Amino acid sequence: MAEQRQHNDCVQGDNLMRLGVQFSGSVPANSSRRWFTHSWPQEWRVVWIVVPTSPVQNQSAQIEWKVQVERQTSTLLKYYLEIKNLSNRTVTIEARYAVLD
């Protein structure tokens, strides 16, 4: 479970975008981990991006991810993020989000 929602507001023209890091964690070599985060308002358009934070390398992709969603209540959504480590070393990650308005 992930409950670490921090955000910054970014304004471009008349559009407001909320950016933040929901959680950080680690994924062991050649394996996958799954996290969830709940109670997101259904009217928000949320985009998820997962980035490796270490180790630093310049060879090939370290991770891939997929996002699934569940309607938690009539007004709230729960997101599931499955993150796969493509490398032979443990990778630390940040799960970042953007709420588009």
Per-range role (PLM):
Residues 2-94, 98-101:
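Extracellular attachment/recognition segments
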